[in-house]
Amino acid sequence: MEKRIIIMTESSKFSGKCVAGIDVDSGEWVRLVSDDPETHGAIANEDLFYENGRRCELLDVVDVLIVGECNDDIQPENVMIDTSQNIEYVGKASIDDVLEIHPAENLDEILGNKYSYILEQKVNTVGYSLALVEVTDLEIMEVEIGRASCRERV
């Protein structure tokens, strides 16, 4: 089965990437995972290139061949992709296009609480692991984590 998604996130995961987006047809979140148990389903960097050699970017609209649902209680958005096939570039979306398909979620809590972490006993009860939220009062602070190292914290 093929899904058309708008790429919304890409982050590092083991030696690969964690990639998620919005399903254009359903408006639901989709996280792309591989069948590689050593990387816990991370998508290899080479699997994020189109046939023409261009690399997938945020807000790209792509067609991806899905080989199955993952049935993961903690990350119910996970779908297994066929990594033997290139993802196919369809076009570029704007943030307005995304919000038309999937409006920002109005949540009092993210992942079931107001903290930057989730308790282990609560993780199976949340029912989602991805959310699109509108931030109205963002504050970025520089935090010292060692003698010569600083890090930003939101």
Predicted regions: what is each one?
Residues K114-I140:
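Intrinsically disordered, low-complexity linker/tail regions enriched in polar/charged residues
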Residues L65-V67, D82, M141:
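A structural detector for beta-sheet-dominated domains
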Residues M1-V64:
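N-terminal ordered "arm"
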Residues M80-Q121:
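Short peripheral tails and domain-boundary helices/loops at the edges of structured domains
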Residues E144-V154:
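Residue-level detector of conserved catalytic or cofactor/ligand-binding positions
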Residues I5-M8, V19, R31-S34, V79-V90, ...:
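Generic preference for hydrophobic/aromatic residues in regular secondary structure cores
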Residues E69-I81:
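Short, Lys/Arg- and Gly-enriched loop/turn segments at beta-strand edges
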